[in-house]
Amino acid sequence: MDAATSFGCASKGPDPLWRYLTEHDPKYERKKKLKISGRELASVPTQIFSLDQLQVLEMSPERESCLRYRMELLPQEISRLRNLTCLYVDSNNLKKIPAEIGTLSHLERLTLSNNNLSSLPPEMGALQRLHSLHLANNSLTELPSPLCQLRSLTFLDVSDNKIGTIPSSIRQLEKLETLLLLFNSLDSLPEDVCLLRNLRTLWLGNNHLQSLPTSFGELVNLDWGYNYCSCNFEGNPLESPPPEVCSRGPEEIKDYFLSFHRTQRH
């Protein structure tokens, strides 16, 4: 199974390449992959859980496959696939993730977007090789605590949820480069976010933020050419600092707060 294999849709035959993955990262072109598809499938084929050398598994109805079946529960047997590095189960009807996912110690990418998840199992904190996690468009009301144990994480998307607070433990994600928090219910950010010195992309649009942490200007690695104001802060009732200051980058934000503190002292 050196080339990508398509399970189902026999009339179309196997795909010579799994284009979605190779477009996103050539690193995964030579992986042992499986794409579940087929309009007649009514459940996940149990045979796949005997493929213990499988490295990339896609079970997402709205990708290039013709899969109509939408999972409501990720099978516990997923734990048998100990060599998985990438798991794509977005655009299903998942309401929970089994604790067994914590046994997938080689997992590097996990896509859970467009489901109905309101929590994550504590066992997910064991995924210490995970560097990319997609959780957009779910039903999360807080940033699940297991996420803050994922020390290798460089990309985290929790956009379009109902998240109201960010825990101080987010400071543990020291390698994080991209944090997407758009379309949530945040009315504040902890100062701890400002300790994520490797952040290059931070999207906060369409929340309820009236102010930024006073240390926000310390995030000097933010790519302000890409994170201009309309992307970064649009849709927030910001007052401190005002949007026109934010759009000028970290130095202006730092100067704003320094000036503000001097005024307060006098």
Functional labels for PLM-detected ranges:
Residues 1-100, 104-168, 175-178, 208-210, ...:
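The feature captures the LRR N-terminal capping module
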Residues 45, 168-169, 174-204:
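Glycine/serine-rich loop-strand microenvironments at binding/catalytic pocket rims
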